[in-house]
Amino acid sequence: MSELVALRGASFAYEDGPTVLDGLDFEVREGRALALLGRNGSGKTTLMRLLSGGLRPRSGELRVEGRPVSYDRKGLTRLRTTVQLVVQDPDDQLFAASVSQDVSFGPLNLGLSDAEVRARVDEALAALDIAALADRPTHLLSYGQRKRTAIAGAVAMRPRVLILDEPTAGLDPDGQERLLATLDSLRASGTTVVMATHDVDLALRWADDAALLTPSGAHTGPAAAALARTDLLRQAGLRLPWGVAAARLLRAQGLLDASAPGPRSPEELNALTAAPATASGPADS
């Protein structure tokens, strides 16, 4: 998979504050679902804002498809049609009177024709399953609907990379499942998705890769391997995912081969634990 967006040697400090990121190398690879994890204050939000152009590194550089980003109007426009960030609180992002007006804001600022803007808005509303809310005032939306509207505004820009800050936070289980299904659909249509989360179980289940932000830097690898690194999890202030713990127990009991992948969801765990009984045939009656 090719590198879409990358930070090279990037450092950043807020005014009159400590250095948040120092000499960081970080990349988003095309087609990979990436979970970004770390304790509060580890720099996740800063990293996401650097990747999306909301902040500029004090040193180092941001690259898109191998080319350094220029922070002039043309360069930032190119970046924002490649990378879109959706913040955690939708109320920090929504401002227009209605859902369709809010979703149309980004495309309108690209100077597109009215017909193209309408097409993008309709496409984004359909992707987030909120077409029926197009004319609804944003202040009358539920929290989950506001989340979906904020994501639709980013999707309407047709980015190649969609970065989401804690997108499942505050959603009930049904809302979480619906959102994850939507993200899977976006990935299937070619969008690379990055999700910041504190939920290690969600990261194990959903992500192809996981990046753990620790005081020693960003450590990225296949999710199942990265989230089994107890040393890195400890540095990142995270617990061991239940799926990793379950896999270790199954291997200790001889129920899972050492080279076989562990369960990433309850359904996979049920399948693994049912396999020995199935293999041995039906029980005597």
Language-model features: locations:
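Catalytic Walker B motif of ABC-type/P-loop ATPase nucleotide-binding domains
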Residues: 162-165
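Conserved switch/coupling elements of ABC/ABC-like ATPase nucleotide-binding domains
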Residues: 211, 215-225
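Helix-to-loop junction immediately C-terminal to a conserved catalytic motif
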Residues: 52
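ABC ATPase NBD Q-loop/coupling interface
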Residues: 61-78
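ABC ATPase C-loop
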Residues: 154-155
